[in-house]
Amino acid sequence: MLPVLYTGLAGLLLLPLLLTCCCPYLLQDVRYFLRLANMARRVRSYRQRRPVRTILRAFLEQARKTPHKPFLLFRDETLTYAQVDRRSNQVARALHDQLGLRQGDCVALFMGNEPAYVWIWLGLLKLGCPMACLNYNIRAKSLLHCFQCCGAKVLLASPDLQEAVEEVLPTLKKDAVSVFYVSRTSNTNGVDTILDKVDGVSAEPTPESWRSEVTFTTPAVYIYTSGTTGLPKAATINHHRLWYGTGLAMSSGITAQDVIYTTMPLYHSAALMIGLHGCIVVGATLALRSKFSASQFWDDCRKYNVTVIQYIGELLRYLCNTPQKPNDRDHKVKKALGNGLRGDVWREFIKRFGDIHVYEFYASTEGNIGFVNYPRKIGAVGRANYLQRKVARYELIKYDVEKDEPVRDANGYCIKVPKGEVGLLVCKITQLTPFIGYAGGKTQTEKKKLRDVFKKGDIYFNSGDLLMIDRENFVYFHDRVGDTFRWKGENVATTEVADIVGLVDFVEEVNVYGVPVPGHEGRIGMASLKIKENYEFNGKKLFQHIAEYLPSYARPRFLRIQDTIEITGTFKHRKVTLMEEGFNPTVIKDTLYFMDDAEKTFVPMTENIYNAIIDKTLKL
């Protein structure tokens, strides 16, 4: 009997060692899945409550429990939960009483990072009004498109964006849209002010009846994402999805004692849904900055006692490129949440700035699948959790990059790729993993659906991303497919850029694509041009046109002049070869140009310019 007992005890003692050797990530996998399952259980219970428990409800509870706790830190200003609560009450009352807004009326917000963005958003939640988050870099046609597809009745804009507002004001007035600056004075005829109205109303709590019709399926916010259709698409985010946006903050163990620092724009889902909402759910503090500054980043972290930072890959690279200082590790930052971080930058970042736990993730604003690299393996964007896969039925399928479509077998069904091979990420659309789609028509939504994937009648969400899962079940990002690439943390739709470039009088045809640049994340814009007969290329004119109509991250920095633009049998531009050839003047025989910001023109591409870009002495 004793030998059996000793054998059993020895087995128990050896079990952790055996698990570590055979299944080194099992405990982390189980822990992560249990956190997700617990969150899903709580969100299901929130749905069943009457009224439903929304992010707003979580904020109100925090304001009641810890009214004097700092909620927002901005420059030298500190706002408590109670102060933001009362200010958002005033916003809701002003919009309700003086503008006549009611639940369901959409309001577009066109401004940068500042506390007003947060208390306006909370005020809209108290009214039951969805908010359209307009990218403050967009202009003219794109701005009007974003505004119109969400059906907004009111535009609230920063006075800093006066020129952009005035450009589209005649069209907005024609559409009976009310336009207000988030200020107390206006220098634009036809544009009113909102802060004076907010100042003049009560800060007492708003009636729940103002938002009584809000359910989990009610649209809460529209966040814009560029896609293959050219113009930005308004992803519909309902109140149910807002909760799942906080998943990364909760799964990474953020608590009420944390101070989260974000320099990313609040019109992005990362800053709004992960940063702000994650902060609210746990009762933490959010430190805001209007725009990212590499030179001020760590000073801000020390000033605000930051413990958690948000990033995109480019951001951490910028920090690594700053001159080293003796106090590089003199900070309290323990965690970093974000995506797009290259392995070499990751290593350099933690080597220089300390053992900061980096939580890299993969997700999209509108998608129904996401991954988190909770074991923090450098270079991976996430982990394919076996238990998670039982709920979210995703696959990687073979994809023909040249034809820009999935590969199908003789029966017409998609083909799963084995581990270690790159494939298109798709996830089945179910009640547990829904795809809500986009506002402004069904066409864009339908384009993101793949039908008859593995059997007749099934429907999957097409992520548009090529990923790879290795033999250890770690997920790696490979590339984007179709007509979208990513630069400076922003999605760039090639068709939108091509439409703008094609308006120049000497351009007959244009093919826009992204090319990789050594030492940089994503791909930078490049355009192949065919010049009209009897016209000449004019670099200064093209520069002025592009600078006027495109934000800096979307501007093609390289041009390639061609006699013929190649197309496929289905009349799509061929991009693969062009992308592979890049912008090296010693390889490409066609005439190349470089966008020179200092000279405000396109100049001939030379070996010296090319070498300066490769050596990083010329910044892009």
From Swiss-Prot:
Database matches in Gene3D superfamilies: 3.30.300.30, N-terminal domain of ligase-like
PROSITE patterns named in the record: AMP_BINDING
Residue intervals annotated with topology Lumenal: 1-4, 128-267
This protein's UniProt keywords: Acetylation, ATP-binding, Cell membrane, Endoplasmic reticulum, Fatty acid metabolism, Ligase, Lipid metabolism, Lipid transport, Membrane, Microsome, Nucleotide-binding, Peroxisome, Phosphoprotein, Transmembrane, Transmembrane helix, Transport
Changes seen on gene knockout: Conditional knockout in liver results in decreased long-chain fatty acids (LCFA) uptake by hepatocytes and decreased peroxisomal long chain and very long-chain acyl-CoA synthetase (VLACS) activity.
EC numbers on record: 6.2.1.15, 6.2.1.3, 6.2.1.24, 6.2.1.7
TM helices/strands, residue ranges: 5-27, 107-127, 268-288
Record's catalysed reaction(s): a fatty acid(in) = a fatty acid(out); (9Z)-octadecenoate(out) = (9Z)-octadecenoate(in); a long-chain fatty acid + ATP + CoA = a long-chain fatty acyl-CoA + AMP + diphosphate; (5Z,8Z,11Z,14Z)-eicosatetraenoate + ATP + CoA = (5Z,8Z,11Z,14Z)-eicosatetraenoyl-CoA + AMP + diphosphate
Gene Ontology molecular function: arachidonate-CoA ligase activity; ATP binding; cholate-CoA ligase activity; enzyme binding; fatty acid transmembrane transporter activity; long-chain fatty acid transmembrane transporter activity; long-chain fatty acid-CoA ligase activity; phytanate-CoA ligase activity
Binding locations of AMP: 222-233
Matches recorded under CDD domains: hsFATP2a_ACSVL_like
InterPro entries, alphabetized: AMP-bd_C (IPR025110), AMP-bd_C_sf (IPR045851), AMP-binding_CS (IPR020845), AMP-dep_synth/lig_dom (IPR000873), ANL_N_sf (IPR042099)
Gene Ontology cellular component annotations, sorted alphabetically: endoplasmic reticulum; endoplasmic reticulum lumen; endoplasmic reticulum membrane; mitochondrion; peroxisomal membrane; peroxisome; plasma membrane
Main EC class the enzyme belongs to: ligase
Signal sequence extent: none
Modified residues (Phosphothreonine): 577
Superkingdom of the organism of origin: Eukaryota
Topology of this chain in the membrane: Multi-pass membrane protein; Peripheral membrane protein
Matching Pfam families: AMP-binding, AMP-binding_C
Positions of post-translational N6-acetyllysine modification: 291
NCBIfam families found in the cross-reference section: PRK08279.1
Family: Belongs to the ATP-dependent AMP-binding enzyme family.
Role this protein plays: Mediates the import of long-chain fatty acids (LCFA) into the cell by facilitating their transport across cell membranes, playing an important role in hepatic fatty acid uptake. Also functions as an acyl-CoA ligase catalyzing the ATP-dependent formation of fatty acyl-CoA using LCFA and very-long-chain fatty acids (VLCFA) as substrates, which prevents fatty acid efflux from cells and might drive more fatty acid uptake. Plays a pivotal role in regulating available LCFA substrates from exogenous sources in tissues undergoing high levels of beta-oxidation or triglyceride synthesis.
Name the record gives this protein: Long-chain fatty acid transport protein 2
Organism: Mus musculus (Mouse)
Gene coding for it: Slc27a2
